[in-house]
């Protein structure tokens, strides 16, 4: 049974909003000391950020003069976007951190007036100043056909094991944590029933997408259910929480919309829900124990086809494609159009 977690060692995060007023009174200079930012510093910074966000007031935050703020892949000034509209954090907030890269992330849920949404936040901290802020916010309001899945923010809870530390003797290396996450994305791309990159799952590994439950992850992959994914590109593993055994990434899943009917590996005939070019932008985390992915959580938002984040350093331009190749539509003729005119306003011969 999954319950809302409240761990004593997470007191700084879970109490962050209850002490929001006190946080907002903390001078920015007190947070902006010249030394580096360790794990507790990063997670405290995230708690301060959440409090400032809910107060619609970034002034107490130690923001870099060169701060970049991106929400749903669009670069904005801060405050703007949901900084202006958030009315409540439903939570519970799940915080992860990576002192080696100065990154801290939060998975939570919010209300904007009466509109619920799932929110993933990424902060980059250098010299105890926030230099980058990134949000992915998914709500029912911004869904269009085919919709990204979305669950109920009031009843959703995180898998409590995601936040638990892994015993030191059982911890995986950064490279191994990233390799499992990358194997997942490689399996999701052109999904044909094969597991790629050495990725491994428990029989009951479950994925939550915008709070909606998708159980038996490996079974879905073995069936080739996600064959419509042409590419999973611009994968950026920006945060590895080695203490908790979690790798987190940003990526984009491209759908060209050419695949129509296809067969699962068990022979079941099905049809792709993607009928035109579009992409999904995602922030996704993977809990890994002993080289096995045990839990997955993601926040998705629909984007224009082949969109990328302003933070993407080296954009991918690979062709992608499905195996076997999809037959392109038959050639057709142009529809009727208005007459072509010359400079005198007369119909031109053509």
Language-model regions: role of each:
Residues 2-18:
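Bacterial N-terminal signal peptides that target proteins for export
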Residues 31-350:
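C-terminal and inter-domain tail/linker signature
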Residues 15-27:
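Bacterial N-terminal signal peptides
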